[in-house]
Amino acid sequence: MGVTKKPDLNDPVLRAKLAKGMGHNYYGEPAWPNDLLYIFPVVILGTIACNVGLAILEPSMLGEPADPFATPLEILPEWYFFPVFQILRTVPNKLLGVLLMVSVPSGLLTVPFLENVNKFQNPFRRPVATTVFLIGTVVALWLGIGATLPIDKSLTLGLF
């Protein structure tokens, strides 16, 4: 059983802290050993038991066996590679495509330095960084959606 510290309400320091709403450290149950030795292992073992139980009751299906001689008509990367895949697919020159791919992380590295003299954290008070972020997000979404379309409709997204 843990040792609890009983608050002395006649103490002027405690009364001042309670008046400010800072007296929560003077009463209650200590974290050691009650929480760390008894409650946390129960929560961790319960989480592991739930995961194992779900894995046993609902195993993931493997799907159909792989056929190395049957390739899909159009091979697409994972969804988070769609914008880069679209850049490589639409740019005719390989060197220019690689340079554009390198410009993505280098452009992201320059965003914090656009308004580093600005002391505000509110995005509405940092218009240049916010505009660069919004334009980058729109371009990434445009490239990502375009990568899922055929090559003749990919740049206009089939709208024009």
UniProtKB/Swiss-Prot annotation:
<dbReference type="Pfam" id="PF00032">
    <property type="entry name" value="Cytochrom_B_C"/>
</dbReference>
<keyword id="KW-0793">Thylakoid</keyword>
<feature type="transmembrane region" description="Helical">
    <location>
        <begin position="131"/>
        <end position="151"/>
    </location>
</feature>
<dbReference type="InterPro" id="IPR036150">
    <property type="entry name" value="Cyt_b/b6_C_sf"/>
</dbReference>
<keyword id="KW-0150">Chloroplast</keyword>
<feature type="transmembrane region" description="Helical">
    <location>
        <begin position="36"/>
        <end position="56"/>
    </location>
</feature>
<dbReference type="GO" id="GO:0009767">
    <property type="term" value="P:photosynthetic electron transport chain"/>
</dbReference>
<keyword id="KW-0249">Electron transport</keyword>
<keyword id="KW-0602">Photosynthesis</keyword>
<keyword id="KW-0472">Membrane</keyword>
<keyword id="KW-1133">Transmembrane helix</keyword>
<dbReference type="GO" id="GO:0016491">
    <property type="term" value="F:oxidoreductase activity"/>
</dbReference>
<comment type="function">
    <text>Component of the cytochrome b6-f complex, which mediates electron transfer between photosystem II (PSII) and photosystem I (PSI), cyclic electron flow around PSI, and state transitions.</text>
</comment>
<keyword id="KW-0813">Transport</keyword>
<dbReference type="InterPro" id="IPR005798">
    <property type="entry name" value="Cyt_b/b6_C"/>
</dbReference>
<feature type="transmembrane region" description="Helical">
    <location>
        <begin position="95"/>
        <end position="115"/>
    </location>
</feature>
<comment type="similarity">
    <text>Belongs to the cytochrome b family. PetD subfamily.</text>
</comment>
<dbReference type="GO" id="GO:0009535">
    <property type="term" value="C:chloroplast thylakoid membrane"/>
</dbReference>
<dbReference type="InterPro" id="IPR048260">
    <property type="entry name" value="Cytochrome_b_C_euk/bac"/>
</dbReference>
<dbReference type="GO" id="GO:0045158">
    <property type="term" value="F:electron transporter, transferring electrons within cytochrome b6/f complex of photosystem II activity"/>
</dbReference>
<comment type="subunit">
    <text>The 4 large subunits of the cytochrome b6-f complex are cytochrome b6, subunit IV (17 kDa polypeptide, petD), cytochrome f and the Rieske protein, while the 4 small subunits are petG, petL, petM and petN. The complex functions as a dimer.</text>
</comment>
<keyword id="KW-0812">Transmembrane</keyword>
<dbReference type="InterPro" id="IPR005870">
    <property type="entry name" value="Cyt_b6/f_cplx_suIV"/>
</dbReference>
<keyword id="KW-0934">Plastid</keyword>
<protein>
    <recommendedName>
        <fullName>Cytochrome b6-f complex subunit 4</fullName>
    </recommendedName>
</protein>
<dbReference type="GO" id="GO:0045156">
    <property type="term" value="F:electron transporter, transferring electrons within the cyclic electron transport pathway of photosynthesis activity"/>
</dbReference>
